[in-house]
């Protein structure tokens, strides 16, 4: 059973490990950058940062949104071992769709995230 919830500061390490290679090809450098980037998200849009946990309380997915007045940005969308965690993908999609129901602005999404959303 998976559960979606708002990200907390104590989740930053796990999320940074998951997204490190998005920040740099060197894993250690990427981790440091991802950690700072994730902390920044929690400061800027704390109510729009989500994680999905498995039954062992391990984070298997993360999504960060920037719902702005003129541009709605899907900043990060990551699912670990997506073939085994399709339910996590479904939970994130459902959360995202709730946001998009009333959005009448441009939606920005990186191609990598978009590919995951439609798969």
Predicted stretch roles:
Residues 1-33:
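Short amphipathic alpha-helix that is part of the acyltransferase structural core
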Residues 14-18, 37, 91, 95:
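Alpha-helical elements of Rossmann-like donor-binding domains used by nucleotide-donor carbohydrate transfer enzymes
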Residues 84-99:
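Conserved acetyl-CoA-binding loop-helix of GNAT-fold acetyltransferases
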Residues 51, 57-66, 73:
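Conserved beta-strand in the GNAT
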Residues 100-112:
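Conserved GNAT acetyl-CoA-binding A-motif
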Residues 28-49:
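Active-site rim helix/loop that mediates acceptor-substrate recognition in acyltransferases
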Residues 111-119:
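Conserved active-site alpha-helix within GNAT-family acetyltransferase domains
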Residues 70-82:
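Conserved acetyl-CoA binding element of GNAT-fold acetyltransferases
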């Amino acid at each position: 059973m998976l559960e979606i919830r708002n990200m907390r500061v104590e989740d930053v390490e796990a999320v940074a490990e998951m997204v490190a290679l998005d920040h740099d090809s060197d894993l250690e450098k990427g981790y440091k950058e991802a950690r700072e980037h994730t902390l920044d998200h929690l400061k800027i849009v704390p109510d729009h940062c989500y994680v999905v946990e498995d039954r062992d309380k391990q984070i298997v997915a993360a999504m960060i949104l920037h719902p702005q007045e003129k541009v709605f940005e899907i900043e990060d969308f990551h699912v670990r071992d997506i073939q085994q965690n399709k339910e996590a993908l479904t939970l994130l999609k459902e959360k995202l769709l709730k946001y998009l129901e009333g959005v009448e602005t441009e939606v920005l999404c990186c191609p990598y995230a978009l590919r995951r959303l439609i798969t």
